[in-house]
Amino acid sequence: MKNVTHSFVFLAHWPFAGSFGLNTDILATNLINLTVVVGVLIFFGKGVLKDLLDNRKQRILSTIRNSEELRRGTLEQLEKARIRLQKVELEADEYRMNGYSEIEREKENLINATSISLEQLEKSKNETLFYEKQRAMNQVRQRVFQQAVQGALGTLNSCLNTELHFRTIRANIGILGAIEWKR
């Protein structure tokens, strides 16, 4: 029994903790707020950004696969053109014996047309990949910016109540009044 009453007497002699106050150091407060906002953005935005990048990666890979299929088709056409070229060369040998040179021109035109077609397809593939990459980067930038703004507004709205707002305004008016008084 004596120990129990001694404990209550001991608690009565403890000093009280300091009171809760408003930190008026704007630079330190903003640094803390920015740290919290950046931490929240990283924590919540990491998953969304990863999903967005994964989706974009799948689209780009799909575009690459499509381009590769086009390339294979073009190579098949090239192989057919080579077979046709061989046939034309055989015919050319026959016509050369007869003195015709028209087949040689047809061969060159066929090779040039196939080469131009391949170059155009390769150029088209490269342009498609470039524009898809640019579009993906722009979408990611826009999404990250929107999430950052929404997160910051949410944090501000949840932390800023009317009483805190009025106290901040009064403190700033006091600071401005002190500056005006010094002039």
From Swiss-Prot:
The entry's cellular-component GO terms read: chloroplast thylakoid membrane; proton-transporting ATP synthase complex
Q: Which organism is it from?
A: Sorghum bicolor (Sorghum)
Name-wise, this protein is ATP synthase subunit b, chloroplastic
Record-linked InterPro entries: ATP_synth_b/b'su_bac/chlpt (IPR002146)
User: From what superkingdom does this record's organism come?
Assistant: Eukaryota
Q: Which CDD domains match?
A: ATP-synt_Fo_b
In the bilayer, the protein is annotated as: Single-pass membrane protein
GO MF entries: proton-transporting ATP synthase activity, rotational mechanism
Q: How does it assemble?
A: F-type ATPases have 2 components, F(1) - the catalytic core - and F(0) - the membrane proton channel. F(1) has five subunits: alpha(3), beta(3), gamma(1), delta(1), epsilon(1). F(0) has four main subunits: a(1), b(1), b'(1) and c(10-14). The alpha and beta chains form an alternating ring which encloses part of the gamma chain. F(1) is attached to F(0) by a central stalk formed by the gamma and epsilon chains, while a peripheral stalk is formed by the delta, b and b' chains.
Keywords assigned = ATP synthesis, CF(0), Chloroplast, Hydrogen ion transport, Ion transport, Membrane, Plastid, Thylakoid, Transmembrane, Transmembrane helix, Transport
Family the entry assigns: Belongs to the ATPase B chain family.
Q: What else is known?
A: In plastids the F-type ATPase is also known as CF(1)CF(0).
Where, per UniProt, does this protein localize? Plastid, Chloroplast thylakoid membrane
What are the transmembrane regions? 25-45
Q: What does this protein do?
A: F(1)F(0) ATP synthase produces ATP from ADP in the presence of a proton or sodium gradient. F-type ATPases consist of two structural domains, F(1) containing the extramembraneous catalytic core and F(0) containing the membrane proton channel, linked together by a central stalk and a peripheral stalk. During catalysis, ATP synthesis in the catalytic domain of F(1) is coupled via a rotary mechanism of the central stalk subunits to proton translocation.
